[in-house]
């Protein structure tokens, strides 16, 4: 065996130990009992540090750490929203909060908390699948196989079909990388890239036999990590020639291990690389996974000593400004991973866990 092999093995072991020995603390969302519904679908930390929650059926929620402000249609505000199912969130440079629902797109002005529906003809009353505010202050969103571009004031700047091999595909996410390139990830499709010079989206080479769900740029390793629906996490390496669309797609065996027994492990909902340790956190259909990145490969980190036990139903994860990882969930409820050894705790309710097969925290 080569010296490089031993070096990589030692690094891998040290990486695993460094994470597991840090006393990762899991705490349930402190304001969980104040939510209008138990389940959070998406989380956003705004420019002022407040947390916003997209819920299914409970509307949009703002959390200041002590109380929850709820924006939804109810007896007091029956016509505020066409749907209380919030699908996606974004904040633009003008401090407007944009959010999609199952029946339309809305913009909230944080100066007065007034909510306006974006009444573009085609988009009105459609399910909004994804939204992204980018560096120039504009907003990109998608609904029913179409992509829409809006100014911060809510003016539609353009609309584009989200096509892959001649067929319209729904968008799972938008992503703007460090070079301000805008990417579109398609369910049942592939990758598109926006070209400002022609105001058009062009397909990018996507050799993986599974649709992309979310992507992040890894500047340190000069690649992108792409969550897929069915093939785990893929490493995407672009050509050094900016004119070339050739890419290298590397499957990551660590995210495919045990596929036959646990196929949901390869169905990824979201991922992020945390800023504190450089760990890649991955929420899949069955659990939350953690990986250390060594030599362009993912190496699993043992999470049994700090994560809730049993099967989990989670959603897309985020990192806050303090480096904590927020995990929205159905079972268990939303929880936060932090690295403060002075904080404890989670309290599993074993009786309910035994009955349901899912972890319950009190």
Provide a role label for each language-model segment:
Residues 1-362:
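Carboxylate-rich, polar loop motifs that coordinate divalent cations or form catalytic acidic clusters
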């Amino acid at each position: 065996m080569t010296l490089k092999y031993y070096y990589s093995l030692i690094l891998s072991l040290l990486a695993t130990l460094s994470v597991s020995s840090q006393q990762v603390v899991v705490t349930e969302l402190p304001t969980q009992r104040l939510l209008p519904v138990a389940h959070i679908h998406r989380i956003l930390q705004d420019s002022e540090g407040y947390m916003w929650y997209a819920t299914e059926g409970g509307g949009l929620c703002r959390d200041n750490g002590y109380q929850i402000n709820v924006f939804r249609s109810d007896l007091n505000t029956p016509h505020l929203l066409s749907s209380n199912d919030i699908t996606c969130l974004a904040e633009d440079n003008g401090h407007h909060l944009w959010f999609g629902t199952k029946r339309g797109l809305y913009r909230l002005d944080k100066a007065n908390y007034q909510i306006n529906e974006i009444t573009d003809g085609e988009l009105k009353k459609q399910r909004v699948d994804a939204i992204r505010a980018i560096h120039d202050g504009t907003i990109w969103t998608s609904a029913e196989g179409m992509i829409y571009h809006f100014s911060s004031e809510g003016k539609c700047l353009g609309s584009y079909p989200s096509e892959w091999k001649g067929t319209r595909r729904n968008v799972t996410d938008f992503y703007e990388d460090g070079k301000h390139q805008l990417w579109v990830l398609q369910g049942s499709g592939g990758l598109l890239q926006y070209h400002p010079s022609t105001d058009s989206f062009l397909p990018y080479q996507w050799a993986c036999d599974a649709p992309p769900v979310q992507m992040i740029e890894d500047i340190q390793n000069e690649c992108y990590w792409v969550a897929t629906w069915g093939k785990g996490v893929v490493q995407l390496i672009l050509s050094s020639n900016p004119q070339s669309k050739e890419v290298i797609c590397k499957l990551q065996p660590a995210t495919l291990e045990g596929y036959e027994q646990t196929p949901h492990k390869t169905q990824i909902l979201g991922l992020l690389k945390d800023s504190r340790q450089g760990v890649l956190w991955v929420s899949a259909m069955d659990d939350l996974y953690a990986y250390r990145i060594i030599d362009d490969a993912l190496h699993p980190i043992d999470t049994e000593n700090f994560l809730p036990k049993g099967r989990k139903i989670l959603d897309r994860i985020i990192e806050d400004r303090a480096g904590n990882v927020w995990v929205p969930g159905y079972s268990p409820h939303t929880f936060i991973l932090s690295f403060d050894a002075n904080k404890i705790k989670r309290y599993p309710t074993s009786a309910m866990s035994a009955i349901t097969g899912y972890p319950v925290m009190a």
